[in-house]
């Protein structure tokens, strides 16, 4: 039996992960373990569902970079609402739901570069996409591609 203990903030004592971690923290600890383990094992596909919940900015950028590094070794499928994470993806799909009457259909659409810029701008700016959000999205994608 193994019990992980962590301190989620500086100056706090280590406590059992299962008792103190939020869903987002559990996801990020899982990501950290996968990054370390990836150098020693070959897992063909990893799936992360909102591993970036509760973070933003530079932390989201780091999570995106780590997912990209994992994707260099195998397939990574990640659901995200963070443009900083999505910008690092090798491939970007937009998921949406169409409701007609009493039924719903989920759609997945592969995005080309311009569609990625448009989607990142939507993620950054919401319903009102402006020239400024489009410029920011394009820059975000270019920086993540380097």
Residue ranges with predicted function:
Residues 15, 40-41, 53-61:
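Conserved D-loop-proximal element of ABC-family nucleotide-binding domains
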Residues 14-20:
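Short pre-catalytic strand/loop immediately N-terminal to key active-site residues, enriched for Gly-Thr
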Residues 49-50:
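Walker B catalytic acidic pair
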Residues 21-22, 26, 119:
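ATP phosphate-binding glycine-rich loop and adjacent ATP-lid/helix-beta elements
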Residues 35-39, 57, 69:
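Conserved helix-loop functional segments at active or binding sites
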Residues 3-4, 8-11, 26-46:
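GG-anchored amphipathic helix commonly corresponding to the ABC/SMC/Rad50 NBD signature/C-loop
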Residues 2, 58-146:
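C-terminal lobe/lid and adjacent interdomain/linker elements of RecA-like ASCE P-loop ATPase modules
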Residues 7, 54-56, 79:
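Generic beta-strand/beta-sheet core signal
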């Amino acid at each position: 039996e193994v019990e992980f203990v962590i301190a989620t903030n500086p100056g706090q004592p280590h406590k059992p992960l299962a008792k103190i971690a939020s869903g987002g923290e559990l996801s990020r600890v899982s990501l950290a373990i996968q990054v370390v383990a990836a150098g020693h094992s070959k897992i063909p596909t990893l799936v992360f569902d909102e591993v970036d919940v509760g973070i933003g900015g530079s932390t989201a950028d780091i999570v995106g970079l780590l997912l990209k590094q994992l994707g260099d070794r195998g397939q990574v499928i990640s659901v995200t609402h963070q443009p900083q994470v999505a910008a690092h993806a090798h491939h970007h799909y937009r998921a949406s739901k169409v409701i007609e009457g009493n039924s719903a259909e989920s759609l997945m659409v592969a995005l080309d570069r311009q569609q990625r810029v448009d989607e990142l701008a939507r993620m950054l700016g919401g319903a009102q996409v402006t020239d400024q959000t489009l410029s920011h999205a394009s820059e975000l994608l270019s920086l993540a591609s380097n």
